[in-house]
Amino acid sequence: MALPPLADEAIVLGAVADNWREAVRAAGAALADSGAALPAYADEMIRMIEEHGPYVVIAPGLALAHARPGPEVLHNGLAVVTLQTPVNFGHPHNDPVSVVLGLAVADAEAHLASVADLANVFNDDDAIPALAAATTADEVKRIMGISL
């Protein structure tokens, strides 16, 4: 299975966020702008982190914001948000975060497949710093291994 679609509208470079909630909200807005999710999906992603802690910070500098499949998800989609200034999520080892991925999937099977595919992308130690430094949507897609 390939990564979920990554529309140009879902790539936000140099976003300003004062805290992790604003960073996650930026990822949710990018998913909404791409048509993958409703704006309320950002609230669901934030709620998951409030309930379960900073488990979404999956590697140094990288958060994978997501929520359960539900009515807020319109179709599978991915968002990439780089932050002008990194923010802390409260993770003991992987803060601060400079790249927030937003993941919206319609079912649990797609969720597992998407996470596995993303893990393959980030097996490359250079991927996170490269994304954080990216200046164009095409550059982000190249780093993510998505055909242009």
Residue ranges and their predicted role:
Residues 1-148:
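Cytosolic covalent-transfer regions centered on His/Cys nucleophiles
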